[in-house]
């Protein structure tokens, strides 16, 4: 029996990885990798601290701050900072664990980490957010650096928060260095960074469509959840490529298209303005072509869809919703969010892939499908190191290459280690898990983090 406290989110992430490794031929071919999994599942370092700040009424407020520095075998710790009242150590360990293998799939030199605080930015003034960010960085700056740990944004941390934190770091450390990514373009940021996760997701699924013989996005109906950066830019790219976007959502409910036309660019621009003001989609003035469904996720309300892209948060597609998507004719599911599908939902998709073969749904995990965001963070780090800026076209081209490599790496690894029947699509979840794990495990072995008996 474990002596650790219950960590349901982390345990789910670990089980999902371990299950796919066990159900492949990896451990038969390389039994020594079992040791690597045991070692890799424990963070190299966990930093927990209090954040004391002053609200607009002069009252003392305190929050819990965290940084999970999970694995540095491939490079400096890399992963976002999340500000949300739900933040706890289990959630950050799950996100950091996923981040290790996601970063490995980009092909860039980045380790895995995650951090944040149980601070709720909603309803806070700009001055309160600034004071919190400065107080948070007063402790965090001791543990990060351009060659040590390079955080980025996540839920609740956008360009404004990155700016406040970077300024606090620069003053405390007396250094101007690429210690955070997602920076403003005039002070070390990269073009395409806000768009990167959404664009990368669409590029990745484009390879799924092409490989399976489903053609292009033209005429495809796509259900999206979420309404933050990932969903916004995925939706814009999908529309640009000829798809019909039929839904967006937030924690209050879902916005669903009622007709054939779908959500428009103008609708998405309006959603962007609402989210920039930190408001809910309940503020959206939807016309006759859209309807608002209070308290619901979109999956059971979108009608016929070809593609589903969860882009909101973890565990947002349940077993029942997975079955509903199959019934609605969905053929492709890819996670724009981290661990967007429950283990039961993944099982529904994977069983369908095995049973229906070429007619099946094809599922891609977040660690592969949404790695575009951290990939462009890595490109921002490279630009900072060289003291230069690449053009939008250069960054976008590099992003396309990274997503293509992530897709084929997972695909070909699945063909190597996972037995498949004739006509069966390769398991992208197994292939991506194995590819990321093997790269990290080998680097850890080479550096003496684990070893085999002679």
From Swiss-Prot:
Q: Where are the transmembrane segments?
A: none
Q: Name one GO molecular function term.
A: glutamate dehydrogenase (NADP+) activity
InterPro entries from the UniProt entry: Aminoacid_DH-like_N_sf, Glu/Leu/Phe/Val/Trp_DH, Glu/Leu/Phe/Val/Trp_DH_C, Glu/Leu/Phe/Val/Trp_DH_dimer, Glu/Leu/Phe/Val_DH_AS, Glu_DH, Glu_Leu_Phe_Val_DH, NAD(P)-bd_dom_sf
Q: Is the Oxidoreductase keyword given for this protein? A: yes
Tell me which residues bear N-acetylserine: 2
What CDD domains does its record include? NAD_bind_2_Glu_DH
* PROSITE patterns noted in UniProt: GLFV_DEHYDROGENASE
- One of the record's GO cellular component terms: cytosol
GO biological process assignments: glutamate biosynthetic process
Which EC class is this protein assigned?
oxidoreductase
Catalytic reaction(s) noted: L-glutamate + NADP(+) + H2O = 2-oxoglutarate + NH4(+) + NADPH + H(+)
Keywords tagged on the record: Acetylation, NADP, Oxidoreductase
Question: According to its UniProt record, which residues of this chain constitute the active site?
Answer: 114
Q: What is its EC number?
A: 1.4.1.4
Disulfide feature? none
Q: How does it assemble?
A: Homohexamer.
Q: Which family is it part of?
A: Belongs to the Glu/Leu/Phe/Val dehydrogenases family.
Q: What is this protein called?
A: NADP-specific glutamate dehydrogenase
Could you tell me which species this protein originates from? Neurospora crassa (strain ATCC 24698 / 74-OR23-1A / CBS 708.71 / DSM 1257 / FGSC 987)
**Gene giving rise to this polypeptide:** gdh
